[in-house]
Regions:
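Charge-rich, low-complexity N-terminal segments
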Residues: 1-120, 124
Length: 126
């Protein structure tokens, strides 16, 4: 049977600061630029969660997208929306909050709760 992918899009807003605590303020500013601002900055994130698998012949689903949306909201959006990622999101603490690391942490939060293969986390900060 053929494998297919389905994608669910969610959105959240959050503040953060890019910095490596082992570096000086000058080095953080040199590497991360204005994103190292001590007063934080924010983004309107768009999150795409891609799952794949074979279609269940009885339901026509790889996964019910409403169920996937509920999992994403419970595990990610409710915890990250209108929060400071560095200070208020337990699974982001002690992590440099780049888009890449946010995607990795979101993957780790979702992988055990999704009843299909989690194949891609895409996050954008337009």
């Amino acid at each position: 049977m053929k494998s297919v992918r389905v994608i669910r899009r969610e959105r959240f807003n959050a503040a953060h600061r890019l910095f490596n605590p082992e570096w000086s303020d000058d080095k953080n500013e040199e590497v991360f630029g204005k994103c190292a601002n001590k007063n934080w900055h924010g983004h309107n994130y768009t999150l795409f969660v891609t799952v794949e698998g074979t279609v269940d012949p009885e339901t026509g689903y790889v996964i019910d997208l409403k169920v996937l949306s509920d999992v994403i909201k419970k595990r990610i959006v409710d915890k990250m929306d209108h929060k400071n990622l560095n200070l208020e999101v337990d699974f982001m603490k002690d992590t440099i909050t780049t888009a890449e690391n946010i995607a990795i942490k979101i993957y780790e939060q979702l992988e055990s709760d999704i009843q299909a293969t989690l194949s891609l986390i895409h996050i954008s900060e337009p």
